[in-house]
Each structure stands twice: as structure tokens, then as C-alpha cells.
Amino acid sequence: MRASGFFISTLKEAPAEAELISHKLMLRAGIIRRLGSGLYTWMPLGLKVLRKVENIVREEMDAAGALELLMPAVQPAELWRETGRWDVFGPQMLKIRDRHERDFCFGPTHEEVITDIARREIKSYRQLPLNFYQIQTKFRDEVRPRFGVMRAREFVMKDAYSFHTDIPSLEETYQAMHVAYCRIFDRLGLKFRPVKADTGAIGGSSSHEFHVLADSGEDAIAFCSDSDYAANVEMAESLPPAGLREAAAGEMQKVRTIAQKTCEEVAAYLNVSIEQTVKTLAVMANGGMHLLLLRGDHHLNETKVRKIPFLSDFRLASEEEIRTETGCLPGFIGPAGLSLPVIADLTVATMSNFVCGANEEDYHLVNVNFGRDLKEPDHVFDIRNVVSGDLSPDGKGKLEICRGIEVGHIFQLLTKYSEAMKANYLDESGQARPMEMGCYGIGVSRIVAAAIEQNHDERGIIFPAAMAPFQVVIIPIGLKKNAEVRAEAEKLYATLSSVGIEVLLDDRDDRPGVMFADMELIGIPHRVVVGERGLKEGNAEYRGRRDEKSEVVPLPEIADFIKSKLAGG
């Protein structure tokens, strides 16, 4: 491709609305252009990148035995009413009505549609298992679409759905999809981690997320560097503290802590470690108030709490509710002297001689011990977020916390949708049974933004080779003025193109500095400069996008040199 025949539209500065570095660079590089809130046009340069991601996804899905189809983007409300999701999915669903006043939605996901296809087409156990996928545009009406295509309202997604006679068959496909996803992200050249995750609103059983590692990631990931353990922080566990409680030291005392409400403030005021404080959270659930106890430096994990049956509908108690039950304000409540159910975190259950609220404004208790000064907790659960340094639950090291951008998610849905929509098959005995289902999604357009978040510098994008719009750019210096420069550049362009290498010949009539800046911004992995001075010495100049310096390569060797670089040499 010649730059003169391509559309390169770069910007010196990013528009003011861009916040994330990927959003800024995608706009500056001419990869996308904003049409409206959360709506973006993929420009020719960006579409080349997007298609490369799609192709790798498609190749690996095909290799894993999935079958591609394409479902309608617009879906009738009747299907969503069958599963009960029409009224509960929320305002993210864009609902529309046709000229006959019939309700439809622009699909945010396709569980209902694919299940409808399955119940119409699949009759016998002999037809199973089957795994269908599509790569299609979705729409979710985000409240505040931000960060460019990272969280756009309209986006490209690969969604797959599998159907099975039993759980072992589902697990086999689930593992095949897990392997396929790892291959996809490996081929794309991304640093990523698959992590155990919550099933969320889609529902079901097992669930794993795939995160591209990036400091700007919205999600916190806990992983062990000494093992394969990794989980989203909302699901991550750690080994509980070992050993028995220390013996009580001194009598419990009530001390005045005027205006010291947070554990940080109380610890500093009393000159004790924050690890020796306990914070008490009052929550309403199951028709009454419960007290949750956490170590002062730990944070509540709401996902874990909601998995406790009698706390599944919990909410934080209001100030008025707390005052009514305890007689004091939040910040000073504690478990002592109250008849409310107490749920302690595993870490708190082993503590002794701790500090907690005295249920009296401006007072705390010190040297508090379970069994002596207050009753043992009614229940002990893991209800906190893990932190760096916690022991990995597999006992093979300590946990570390990093940030990640979710780009893939796989679920075992079981029979949630097949039962609701009566998607049954006939087994060997002729009995109708609901199909077991799996669901497997990849944010195709989001991958591009995530890759840029992970791969950039002060000059622009550094695309992994598999995603770059072009593999090599040739920049001739003085192309219009020097026939020899033009001839050598054209010769190299023809040689590399003839063996299937994607080459961009920057034949624009522009200053070298502008061409260098544009190509670094766009993120093409390999650059060759052909100039008059180099030609006099029989050389070209090569520089990889990640390289700090250029290197001189003899002209007769430059084509083979580039081929070697592309082959990983």
C-alpha cells in the first residue's frame, strides 16, 4: 500500500474529551472518529487492525470446532419475556418499537436468540454437542460512555454458545474454549491472565475472565507468581491466618476518641497499628440488622457477602437505622453489648486485644477479646478483599495485585435459559431433557484499546506484530527529488510485497519529521529509511518501533534482514 493512496489522518493533539491513553492515541492516529456519545467510526487504518483481531479470533474458534453463524441484531421482546429478562436487564438495553407497536431491542447479548434457534433445530442427543459463534455489533446504552471504544455503547463482540446433553460434555467444551482464548491472546501478542470470576447477571455456574494486564485497567486481579492461581479480586481467596489467638493482655477499657471515626484516625490517635483495629459495618438483610466485622485495614467484598444465603439481599444500613439499633452514630459502633447477629471475617476471628467501637459517640474499646469481653461471632466467613502479601489459597506463595482490562469471559450457564425457554432434546430413552449451555464472549473492539493501553510510549502506539495495520513502513527521504532514492524504495517495496509482507510505502510529499512522527504514532513495528546519504554508502537505516536507536543495514541485505525480523530473528 502506498500512503498516497491510503487515508492517513493524524492529529497533533487529542480532543479534550479523551481521558484514557488508548482513546487519545486512537483519535490522534486516525484509527477511530467520534460520531456521538459512545459511537465511533472505525477509519480505514483502524478497520485493518480490527479485522486482524477478528481473523485470529475466527481462526481459533474454527479450530476449536465452533460453527460460525450470524444472528439478527434486533430481537423481539417475546424471547426476553420468556426468560424474564425484558424487565430486569436494565436501561442498558435499547428498546425500540416498530410501526405495528411491537416491542424489540437492539441486542446487548444473544442468549435468548440462540436458545430459540436450538429449541427449533436440535431434537435429539445425536445432534449434540454443538457450539455456535458470531462476530457482530452489539449495543448497550451505557449511562456515561467513556474511554473511547473501551466502554462504547456500540461495539464488536464475538459471542459463542454451546449446547450439551450433560455436564461432562459442557466442561469439555468449556476447557476447549479456555484453551482457544489463551491461544487467541497469545497470538495477538498480549500479556494477559485468565482469572476465576463471578457469574454476574448472566448467571450460571463456573466462570472465568480474561484480562489484558495494564495499569489503567478497571479491574483488580489477584495472582500468585509461584503458581497458576489467579482470580478477580471480587472472587479471590487467601489462606486464613494460622495458629491460635494470642492470650488476652490487660482489661478491656473504654477510651475517649473525640471525632476519630475511621480506623486510620483511631489507630493514629491511640498509637496502635491499624491491623489491631476492627471496623464494624451495619447491614440490613433478611428482615433485620447484622454486624459485619473486618480488620481495620481490610475492605468489604460485597460479592462474597452476597453468596452467604441469609445476606444475599444485604444493603448498608442507614444512619437512622444504625442510631435506632445501637444508639450511636456510624464510626463508633461495635459488637460489644448488642444482641445483633455478628458475622466476622476469617482474619478477625483470630484477633485478640483489638480496638473496636464502644457504641457510644466519641468512644472506643481497647484490649477487646472474644469469649471474655464479647460473645464469639455467630458466623465466620471470608468477606474481605484480598491484599498483596496474603497467602495464596493453593499454599504455593503469596498473592500480588495488578490491574487488568477484561477482554473475554466464559460461563457455564447450565440450564438457566434452556429450562426457561423449553429448549429440550430427546435422550436415548426418548425422554425430553433441557440442554446444558455454555456462553463464551470476547470484546473484539475492546481488545484494540486494551492492546494500546498495554503497548505505547510517549511517541504513540506500539502495536504487537499480529495486530499492526502494516508490518513494515518504508520512508524514502527526498523521494520527489532523487530518482535513485525512489528506485531503491520502490525495489524494496516490491520485494517485500511479493512475499506477502504488508508494507506501507510513505510516498507523501512531506517533511521527514512529519513522516517519522506519523509512523511512530500509528505504531508500525518495523521502519526502513532510504535516503540519499545512506545510498552513497550503500546502506539503509532500520529501526524497530521499540528500539531506542537505528541500525545501518547494507542495501543488498535489507530485504532478508526485514524477513528475519518478521520471523522473530
From Swiss-Prot:
* Superkingdom of origin: Bacteria
Could you give a single Gene Ontology term from the biological process aspect?
A: prolyl-tRNA aminoacylation
Annotated catalysed reactions: tRNA(Pro) + L-proline + ATP = L-prolyl-tRNA(Pro) + AMP + diphosphate
- For this chain, the annotated S-S bridges are none
Give the enzyme's EC designation: 6.1.1.15
Q: Which InterPro entries match?
A: aa-tRNA-synt_IIb, aa-tRNA-synth_II, aa-tRNA-synth_II/BPL/LPL, Anticodon-bd, Anticodon-bd_dom_sf, Pro-tRNA-ligase_IIa, Pro-tRNA-synth_IIa_bac-type, Pro-tRNA-Synthase_IIa_type1
Record's protein name = Proline--tRNA ligase
Annotated source species: Nitrosospira multiformis (strain ATCC 25196 / NCIMB 11849 / C 71)
Whichever gene encodes this chain, its name is proS
